[in-house]
């Protein structure tokens, strides 16, 4: 499908935001877990900001790139997106009472998310 120049720019911006924010979010989550919770309270705000940008950019990308019938690729991306939303919810719900437990759960969910995003194109 041919894209206009302006649509290509929008796609590049959304992809860049999605990937960069997602890398920070997942990377900081894995680092916090590995460090035994060190920095969890300091990074909570930036993590939630990155989660928001990642999810909103992903929604925008889905709306532009995945119109029409759903197939294995879309199902894989949807599983990854669901895990990402769940990870953000867990981090938000646990950041005051038990941040390390929440970060551990979120790390597992984000691992599934990253794998789904990486393999989606090749599924089916």
What residue spans do the PLM features occupy?
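Polytopic transmembrane helical bundles with strong interfacial aromatic enrichment
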Residues: 1-124
């Amino acid at each position: 499908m041919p894209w206009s120049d302006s649509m290509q720019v929008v796609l590049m911006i959304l992809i860049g935001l999605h990937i960069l924010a997602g890398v920070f979010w997942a990377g900081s989550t894995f680092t916090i877990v590995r460090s035994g919770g060190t920095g969890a309270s300091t990074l909570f705000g930036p993590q939630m900001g990155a989660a928001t940008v990642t999810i909103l950019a992903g929604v925008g990308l889905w709306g532009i790139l995945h119109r029409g019938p759903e197939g294995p690729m879309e199902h894989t991306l949807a599983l990854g997106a669901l895990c990402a939303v769940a990870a953000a919810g867990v981090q938000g719900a646990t950041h005051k009472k038990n941040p390390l437990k929440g970060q551990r759960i979120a790390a597992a969910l984000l691992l599934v998310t990253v794998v789904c995003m990486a393999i989606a194109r090749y599924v089916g």
